[in-house]
Design a protein with these regions (language model features):
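Active-site glycine-centered loops adjacent to acidic/histidine catalytic or metal-binding residues
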Residues: 6-7, 37-38, 106, 135-136, ...
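Conserved catalytic scaffold of divalent metal-dependent phosphoesterases
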Residues: 40-122, 155-156, 184, 197
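Charged helix-capping and loop-helix junction motifs
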Residues: 15-22, 115-123, 235-236
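Core catalytic region of metal-dependent phosphoesterases/phosphodiesterases
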Residues: 1-66
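A short helix->loop->beta-strand "cap" motif at the edges of active sites that frequently abuts
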Residues: 28-32, 99, 129, 147-148
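Accessory, non-catalytic peripheral segments of nucleic-acid enzymes
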Residues: 176-307
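Conserved beta-sheet core of the metallophosphoesterase superfamily
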Residues: 114-177
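N-terminal active-site segment of His-dependent metallophosphoesterases
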Residues: 1-20, 97, 292-307
């Protein structure tokens, strides 16, 4: 069976997106159970009410957990009826049935007072379920509470640069024990990266990217001291990465020794530092150079950025 714990649609949906989801669900040819979440909650205008769904699909449309029996298992599920929902697992315990007891909810285990169907360890323990499939949390995770395994896959694909890394699904096997494993999907991924430009911005960007282009989404922030960058020209160097965004947060290079020789406190200070730069050992020279850079940044009223 396939369990989908909500948010297939992100609020509004189009005819094309409905038809694509319909065809995909019909093609799997196994029972599919859906628990609508806070983004695609059940309402008089939601696709769960207004549209037809394949015969192999069961959509839970009540805020109270209800059951659907199939061969070897009973599946319990509920739905959001608004953008927020109370704890739908509170006070629930599965009735003794033949086979496995499986639950599916769009719920949040991270906050006891979450407005998105908070799920607590105590509720999981008392549920009488063998397995509880959750949605809502976009990072994959799992916890065993008593006799119940509770797990969530995250999301099959990130939707922005706050959802980086591997995304995928969970495969759960029910037997004498219940086991779960995360399976990454070959969907485009998001990467939010940063690099110091130094003298070669092309090399700085290239070291963060794979050799061959792909459809992944890269946002690379360029930092450090640099002459003015031509981002358009730099972007063209990496045209084989169509989803690459470059952000310029470099600062103009500043000579930390520019005050040497001035008849001022500042000039005297940097002159003394420079004497250490020329007369000390390599460690003293490193410290003197670093002190000059930091001092220059502070005196110029800028943010301290270590070289």
């Amino acid at each position: 069976m396939m369990l989908i714990s909500g948010d297939i649609f992100d609020r509004a949906y189009s005819r094309e997106s409905y038809q694509a989801v319909y065809r995909a669900l019909e093609s799997v040819q196994v029972p599919v159970f859906i628990s609508p979440g806070n983004h695609d909650y059940v309402s008089m205008t939601s696709p769960w009410v207004t549209e037809k769904w394949p015969a192999n699909v069961t959509v839970f449309t009540r805020e109270k957990l209800t059951k659907k029996q199939i061969s070897g298992a009973t599946v319990w599920g509920a739905a959001f009826l608004a953008p927020e929902a109370p704890s739908l697992l509170e006070g629930f315990r599965a009735e003794p049935e033949e086979g496995f007891a499986i639950g599916i909810l769009h719920g949040d285990t991270t906050q006891a007072k979450s407005p998105y169907c908070p799920v607590t360890a105590g509720q999981i323990r008392e549920s009488g379920l063998h397995y509880l499939a959750l949605g809502h949390i976009h990072e994959a995770g799992a916890l065993q509470v008593g006799d119940t395994l509770c797990a969530w896959p995250g999301c099959p694909m990130g939707t922005g640069y706050d959802e980086t890394g591997e995304k995928g699904v969970r495969i759960v096997e029910l037997g004498q024990t219940v086991t779960s494993r995360f399976v990454p999907l070959n969907t485009p991924r998001f990467y939010d990266l940063e690099t110091t430009v130094a003298d070669d911005p092309v090399a700085a960007v290239a070291k963060l990217l794979p050799a061959a282009g792909n459809q992944d989404f890269y946002r690379i922030t360029l930092t450090g001291a640099s002459e003015a960058l031509d981002l358009s020209k730099l972007q063209n160097k990496f045209s084989h990465f169509p989803n690459l965004i470059l952000r310029d947060q470099t600062v103009p290079p500043v000579d930390p020794w520019q005050a040497v020789g001035e008849d001022s406190f500042e000039g005297t200070y940097f002159t003394l530092l420079q004497e250490n730069l020329h007369s000390g050992d390599s460690e003293q020279q490193r410290i003197a150079q670093l002190a000059a850079v930091i001092s220059r940044q502070l005196l110029d009223g800028g943010e301290v950025k270590l070289p």
